[in-house]
Amino acid sequence: MSTLQSKDPKVFEAVQQELGRQRDKIELIASENFVSEAVMEAQSSVLTNKYAEGYPGRRYYGGCEYVDIVEDLARDRAKEIFGGEHVNVQPHSGAQANMAVYFTILEHGDTVLGMNLSHGGHLTHGSPVNFSGIQYNFVEYGVDKESQRIDYEEVRRLAKEHQPKMIVAGASAYPREIDFAKFREIADEVGAYLMVDMAHIAGLVAAGLHQNPVPHSHFVTTTTHKTLRGPRGGMIICNEEFAKQIDKSIFPGIQGGPLMHVIAAKAVAFGEALQPEFKSYGEAIIRNAKRLGEKLTSEGIDLVSGGTDNHLLLLDLRSLGLTGKVAEKALDDVGITTNKNTIPFDPESPFVTSGIRIGTAAVTSRGLDEEAMDEIGATIALTLKNVDNEEKMNEARERVDALTAKFPMYPNL
């Protein structure tokens, strides 16, 4: 980055500081990951210069013959990974992928069934502060108060009562496997479309470690980062009968020119996900999450639903007398990055919360193993039990420093 350093030292310095943060801290934010250098090279390529409104073979600009190759590669590889008859890789984000599906099927005011945000859903699944909750009549389902797992009978009851035009499945803070076949069964009973947002678990689906929603859904949306370990972006998978409508909803519906450098990076990441070692990576993510959960439980920290089936753990901090806001700050102070998160039936506000959400996708990419999860779990417990003890906090920092030194990140950058 010598050119950037000489041309704009302030931006260069900020980038280097972020590189240092990623190297020197333990990244446990469940929606984050570390992409390969090949993905970064594709995203920083000359494709950033090319405007390409439209789709391969049907562009509104000339000179698109090479970006067409890239977009076709991304679409074909996504089909090979997930199945599905049609793929659109142009959404700039998961939120825009969801928006495109809504615009394809729904009219203003239509009723939709979506997961309550505080129970693990997502802003775009009907939050009243989001376009989805403003534009449409979302009815919320949640988890059972005792098991803290999705109550499928409640979903069925609500579907029969409200007769939604669409049911949205998928979550941003739900640590258990979701039964997409059951959701489709319920959708069919009331004549609703089923959309699955698999953003968090897409990498696990790609590795064959979570039920694939594509055979059960009318529409599947996802981000291309998180467990899929690609660039930040979105994607839609659907049957051929909806292909033209979906494509039209993206362009010209809600976007103009696609980000061809990002689509190239998506293609590279999808190519990586097709390799045998990606399944090993997914298996390691789940092993690490389970081991970390076991260690935290042994340290007396409560987990929502008692554990995990995927990459994600949701910690209930009420027994420690802490809020998520305090815990996030304390952990960041010792070098562990997390995010405060609501838990089901949370008495605190979303700005404070009673929980934190953690995930193992990034630390697994870094090479950390189950033994390291024991150390991370012990360090989290040490921190959360001693937020006002400077000596113990210093000990936690030293343990983080030892781990990050043992597992270097991006040594060639």
UniProtKB/Swiss-Prot annotation:
Pfam annotation, one family: SHMT
Enzyme Commission number, as recorded: 2.1.2.1
Annotated GO MF terms: glycine hydroxymethyltransferase activity; pyridoxal phosphate binding
Binding site for (6S)-5,6,7,8-tetrahydrofolate: L117, G121, H122, L123, E241, S349, P350, F351
Cofactors named for this entry: pyridoxal 5'-phosphate
PTM sites of type N6-(pyridoxal phosphate)lysine: K226
UniProt keywords, alphabetically: Amino-acid biosynthesis, Cytoplasm, One-carbon metabolism, Pyridoxal phosphate, Transferase
GO biological process, one term: glycine biosynthetic process from serine
GO CC terms, sorted: cytosol
Residues with site note (Plays an important role in substrate specificity): H225
InterPro entries tied to this protein: PyrdxlP-dep_Trfase, PyrdxlP-dep_Trfase_major, PyrdxlP-dep_Trfase_small, Ser_HO-MeTrfase, Ser_HO-MeTrfase-like, Ser_HO-MeTrfase_PLP_BS, SHMT-like_dom
Cellular localization per UniProt: Cytoplasm
Main location: cytoplasm
Enzyme class at the top of the EC tree: transferase
Catalytic activity: (6R)-5,10-methylene-5,6,7,8-tetrahydrofolate + glycine + H2O = (6S)-5,6,7,8-tetrahydrofolate + L-serine
Pathway involvement of the protein, from the record: One-carbon metabolism; tetrahydrofolate interconversion; Amino-acid biosynthesis; glycine biosynthesis; glycine from L-serine: step 1/1
Subunit structure: Homodimer.
HAMAP family in the cross-refs: SHMT
UniProt record similarity statement: Belongs to the SHMT family.
Functional note: Catalyzes the reversible interconversion of serine and glycine with tetrahydrofolate (THF) serving as the one-carbon carrier. This reaction serves as the major source of one-carbon groups required for the biosynthesis of purines, thymidylate, methionine, and other important biomolecules. Also exhibits THF-independent aldolase activity toward beta-hydroxyamino acids, producing glycine and aldehydes, via a retro-aldol mechanism.
The protein, known as: Serine hydroxymethyltransferase
Organism: Halalkalibacterium halodurans (strain ATCC BAA-125 / DSM 18197 / FERM 7344 / JCM 9153 / C-125)
